[in-house]
């Protein structure tokens, strides 16, 4: 009855509603014609609304609508009942298939009845109400007409059935397919089999011509099977390719598979092992390779990368056939995944050495293409190229081995040249693609670990791969040519020679490659954002062995800059095409001349100029700016002051090959050149790059090759991020003039420029170097060299500090404080570390510092904008505090040689240095003895004086960085906070609680590397320079 009532309800309501509406209508009509007799009759008829004859048309419409509404409601009710019962029953039946048919029926009946009775009534009432409400709106037509309601009901039903029922395949898996699905079961298996069609992959169907899939499997099978399989595959490929490619049969004459695959970069795979020679031409596809994956030789397999990883066996076979011809790229890729075949171990070892590379080698393939062609011997060819690069490397160390180191040195040079011509555009595009430096940094770390493993291979095989990486990194279009040939190929030698020595011959070497990869002359320089990451690699790599590492660093610089002109890599990238020829000639010694020329190249400074405009304000006031403008002229003289303090001899000794060139350059711009060479490379990366590079190039024609050049990439990223970096460029000039170690710093941050002049630069270098030694530790062999390198570096820094400023050591540590300031300051600081540690032995120190730089840079890059304002504020605070200190020690406005060079420094650099140095000074002073503090205060006061004069311009520039520096200043003002804020100064003592995470990271690194720092401290103490005091404090 309930159900009945529910069903009746809508009809009753509709009738009542109809009556009401009809009465209203009648009333209206009556009111219209009240006294009409016929009207009365009509009224009677109207009153009896149920008589169809008596209804007016409008009433008829209403009635029809009401009837439709009732019907729709009834229909909906029926559907609901069906849903409640039948659909539910269906669900039950599905479940019952698990349990049993009887239970199903029972459950179905019981649930159906209850569900229908309750839910149907409730739903009916609800639907009636809703429909009534809706009808009230205008007409009695239900919102759902019959068809609509039917459709909606059907849809609901379908949904329910799908949800309630288990899919057949699921049931089959669960073994629930019972009587219910028994009929369907046969279908499912058949359908499944058909869908799966494992046979498609099977040989017969593959032969039939599935297309890419078939060709892949067929290729794998054939490679293993032998000539017969290959012949069959060839036929299949011919059929497929002819059908596809030769729609117009005009090309039919050509071997379709070979032609098509070559176009696809699949030539080797498609053609089979037979057309090995064609494959090398296929490798000439390097332009395509640029756009394709580095596994282009395997492009035949649609998923080239996947194929390589998936079918190691097939890949190996392929590598034998096509990889030999295209071995460099394919072999390397294979080397990553698994050792290919014995024939390829050589190339594979390079690849394994360049496993890190291979990651970057997607682009590298393009570069590889060149190198592959040149070291086309495949795996066999590569060892030769690597040997050549090794033999050439010594010259690169002396000069910028970069061009010569290029893997099969000559072959790679030619490769680079050919790539430049054919693949340069593609390489550039690839470099653009590779501009994303974040991935390369990890690779670099990976390479550091692999370095030790691939130490032997790295020297031989790795050099070519670095080339490839660099080529891919060609981010700088102009450098592409130089980078690819001289930059890419030479870089590998640098890494091999410098890095292998630096980090453990093999271990070191790879990191350089990773850095090269990351920094790849083009990419590192071009993608400044990526630079910060890359420089850390370079820093980490070189530290292993100061002597060897350092010469490679110059090479590295060269690679960064461009083959030989790396120093002015920006210029090189600008003039890369013109300088590209140089890379071939550059083999090593030539770099000096090219470097000088490139230094001379003012264009690069012009390029940086845009960024440096803010610095230019300080620059114009400071002679340093002109110095930067004249790449090596001013820096050399200015740095001469600090140069005397610096110990170029140590760097020179370390860099015997480089030493000659560096010495010459250093003579041009003496002492500063060794550290500057490291730092200058960073400057080249930045706007200051040009200026700094020029000085570093002239100062250390060889040293630019050193990692210092790699460090430059980090500065570029900061520049991009911050104009503060632009400010820093002027400091670079000052840096150069003030402190040779600072040259790299200049691009990094003006603060570093000034502070490096002080012995703080030595202390900072020492501290940074300790991180460097930890970095080398990843490659166990490296640590010892790193330690020795730190000692060298420490000595150098002390010398530098002495020349720069007696109390400079702590200030330089203070420079570390700038880390908090702007990322630029941090970058500069790292560079400065590299510079002091890095002319010759600094290889270890700089390389180790570089990794910290990387973190700092990566962290700083984003912070830079904020730091700039913070820095500005900090500068103001510093100015205030310095005002007091100036009053205290106004006697020495520029008394320290450090002070004089700093005035030349751009106001930005001076301000940055003052801020960082002042903070450092405060912190250092607390730990340092009163005498040291007094010296530092005097130097700082003099510097602050000069800087305070320059600060007004700096304030606008660094206004963005002001906030962080301000916070730092308060911490500096409070001795306890100050020490934390200066992780560099007291990282060993306790990890600074600096607000800046980057600083903390650095501090952590330094703390971890305390052993290295302590070792450095020892040398510094031996030096007996003010730096030693700062070192003691640090210890």
From Swiss-Prot:
Regions of compositional bias (Basic residues) in chain numbering: 431-449
Keywords on this record?
Answer: Lipoprotein, Methylation, Myristate, Phosphoprotein
Where are the Asymmetric dimethylarginine modifications? 320
Name of the molecule in the record: NHS-like protein 3
Sites where Phosphoserine occurs are at: 93, 138, 145, 161, 215, 322, 327, 330, 338-339, 341-342, 400, 404, 409, 545, 612, 669, 673, 858, 862, 868, 929, 959, 971, 979
Associated disorder: Genetic variation involving NHSL3 may be a cause of atypical endothelial corneal dystrophy (ECD). The disease follows an autosomal dominant pattern of inheritance in the identified patients. Clinical characteristics of patients with the atypical form of ECD include peripheral endothelial opacities, an opaque ring along limbus, central endothelial opacities, central stromal opacities and corneal edema. The early phenotype of this atypical ECD is characterized by multiple small white translucent spots located in the Descemet membrane of the peripheral cornea.
Q: Where is the composition biased (Low complexity)?
A: 338-365, 517-532, 562-589, 625-645, 652-662, 737-765, 838-848
Q: Which gene name belongs to this protein?
A: NHSL3
Q: Which organism is it from?
A: Homo sapiens
């Amino acid at each position: 009855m309930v159900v009945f009532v529910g069903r009746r309800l809508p009809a009753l309501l509709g009738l009542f509603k109809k009556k009401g509406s009809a009465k209203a209508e009648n009333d209206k009509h009556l009111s219209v014609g009240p006294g009409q007799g016929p009207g009365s009759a009509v009224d009677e008829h109207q009153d009896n609304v149920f008589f169809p004859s008596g209804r007016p048309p409008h009433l008829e419409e209403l009635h029809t609508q009401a009837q439709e509404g009732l019907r729709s409601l009834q229909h909906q009710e029926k559907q609901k009942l069906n849903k409640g019962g039948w659909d539910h029953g269906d669900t039950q039946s599905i479940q019952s298939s698990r349990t049993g048919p009887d239970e199903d029926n029972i459950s179905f009946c019981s649930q159906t009845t209850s569900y229908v009775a309750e839910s149907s009534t409730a739903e009916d009432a609800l639907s009636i109400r809703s429909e009534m409400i809706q009808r009230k709106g205008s007409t009695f037509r239900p919102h759902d007409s019959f068809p609509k309601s039917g459709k909606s009901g059907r849809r609901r039903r379908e949904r329910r059935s799908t949800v309630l029922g288990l899919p057949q395949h699921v049931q089959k898996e669960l073994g629930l397919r019972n009587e219910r699905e028994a009929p369907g079961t046969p279908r499912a298996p058949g359908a499944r089999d058909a869908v799966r069609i494992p046979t498609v992959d099977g040989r017969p169907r593959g032969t039939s011509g599935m297309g890419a899939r078939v060709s892949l499997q067929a290729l794998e099978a054939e490679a293993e099977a032998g000539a017969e399989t290959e012949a069959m595959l060839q036929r299949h490929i011919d059929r497929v390719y002819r059908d596809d490619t030769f729609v117009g049969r005009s090309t039919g004459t050509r071997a379709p598979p070979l032609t098509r695959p070559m176009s696809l970069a699949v030539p080797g795979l498609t053609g089979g092992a037979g057309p090995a020679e064609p494959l090398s031409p296929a490798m000439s596809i390097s332009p395509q390779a640029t756009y394709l994956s580095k596994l282009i030789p395997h492009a035949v397999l649609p998923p080239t990368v996947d194929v390589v990883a998936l079918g190691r066996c097939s890949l190996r076979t392929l590598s034998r056939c096509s990889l030999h011809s295209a071995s460099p790229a394919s072999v390397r890729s294979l080397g990553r995944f698994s050792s290919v075949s014995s024939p390829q171990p050589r190339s594979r070892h390079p690849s394994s050495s360049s496993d890190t590379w291979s990651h970057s080698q997607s682009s590298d393939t393009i570069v590889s293409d060149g190198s592959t062609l040149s070291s086309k011997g495949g795996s066999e060819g590569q060892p030769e190229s690597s040997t050549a690069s090794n033999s050439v490397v010594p010259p690169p160390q002396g000069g910028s081995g970069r061009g010569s180191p290029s893997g099969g040195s000559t072959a790679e040079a030619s490769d680079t040249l050919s790539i430049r011509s054919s693949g340069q555009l593609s390489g550039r595009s690839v470099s653009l693609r590779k501009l994303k430096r974040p991935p390369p940094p990890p690779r670099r770390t990976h390479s550091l670990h692999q370095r030790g493993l691939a130490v032997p291979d790295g020297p031989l095989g790795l050099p070519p791969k670095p080339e490839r990486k660099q080529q891919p990194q060609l981010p700088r279009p102009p450098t592409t040519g130089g980078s690819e040939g001289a930059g890419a190929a030479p870089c590998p030698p640098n890494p091999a020679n410098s890095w292998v020595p630096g980090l453990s011959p093999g271990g070191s070497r790879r990191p350089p490659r990773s850095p090269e990869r990351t920094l790849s002359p083009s990419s590192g320089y071009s993608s400044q954002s990526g630079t910060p990451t890359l420089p850390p690699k370079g820093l980490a790599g070189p530290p292993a062995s100061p002597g060897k590492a350092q010469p490679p660093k110059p090479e590295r610089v060269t690679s960064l800059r461009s083959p030989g002109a790396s120093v002015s890599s920006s210029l090189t990238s600008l003039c890369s095409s013109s300088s590209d020829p140089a890379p071939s000639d550059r083999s090593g010694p030539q770099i000096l001349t090219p470097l000088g020329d490139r230094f001379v190249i003012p264009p690069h400074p012009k390029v940086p100029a845009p960024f440096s405009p803010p610095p230019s304000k300080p620059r114009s006031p400071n002679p340093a700016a002109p110095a930067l403008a004249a790449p090596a002229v001013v820096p050399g003289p200015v740095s001469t002051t600090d140069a005397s303090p610096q110990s170029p001899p140590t760097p020179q000794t370390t860099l015997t090959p480089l030493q000659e060139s560096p010495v010459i350059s250093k003579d041009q711009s003496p002492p500063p050149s060794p550290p500057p060479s490291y730092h200058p490379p960073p400057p080249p990366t930045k706007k200051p790059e040009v200026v700094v590079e020029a000085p570093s190039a002239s100062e250390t024609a060889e040293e630019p090759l050193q990692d210092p050049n790699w460090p430059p990439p980090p500065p570029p990223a900061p520049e991009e991020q911050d104009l503060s970096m632009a400010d820093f460029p002027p400091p670079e000039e000052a840096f150069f003039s003030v402190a040779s170690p600072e040259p790299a710093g200049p691009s990094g941050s003006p603060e570093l420029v000034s502070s490096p002049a002080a012995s703080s630069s030595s202390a900072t270098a020492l501290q940074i170097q300790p991180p460097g030694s930890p970095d080398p530790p990843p490659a166990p062999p490296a640590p010892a060299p790193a330690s020795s390198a730190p000692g060298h570096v420490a000595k150098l820094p002390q010398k530098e500090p002495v020349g720069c400023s007696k109390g400079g050591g702590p200030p330089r540590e203070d420079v570390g404080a700038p880390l908090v300031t702007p990322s630029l300051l941090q970058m500069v600081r790292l560079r400065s570390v590299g510079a002091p540690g890095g002319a010759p032995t600094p290889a270890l120190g700089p390389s180790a510092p570089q990794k910290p730089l990387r973190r700092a840079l990566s962290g700083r890059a984003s912070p830079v904008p904020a730091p700039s304002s913070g820095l500005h504020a900090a500068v103001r605070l510093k100015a205030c505090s310095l005002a007091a200190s100036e009053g205290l020690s106004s006697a020495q406005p520029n008394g320290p040689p450090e002070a004089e060079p700093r005035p030349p420094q751009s106001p930005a650099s001076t301000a940055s240095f003052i801020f960082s140095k002042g903070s450092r000074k405060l912190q250092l002073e607390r730990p340092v003895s009163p005498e040291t503090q007094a010296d530092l205060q005097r130097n700082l006061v003099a510097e602050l004086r000069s800087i305070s004069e320059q600060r007004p311009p700096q304030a606008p520039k660094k206004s963005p960085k002001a906030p962080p520096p301000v916070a730092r200043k308060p911490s500096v003002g409070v001795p306890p906070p100050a020490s934390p804020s200066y992780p560099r100064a007291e990282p060993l003592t306790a990890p600074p609680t600096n607000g800046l995470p980057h600083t903390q990271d650095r501090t952590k690194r330094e703390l971890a590397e305390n052993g290295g720092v302590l070792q450095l401290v020892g040398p510094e103490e031996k030096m007996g320079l003010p730096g030693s005091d700062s070192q003691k404090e640090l210890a």
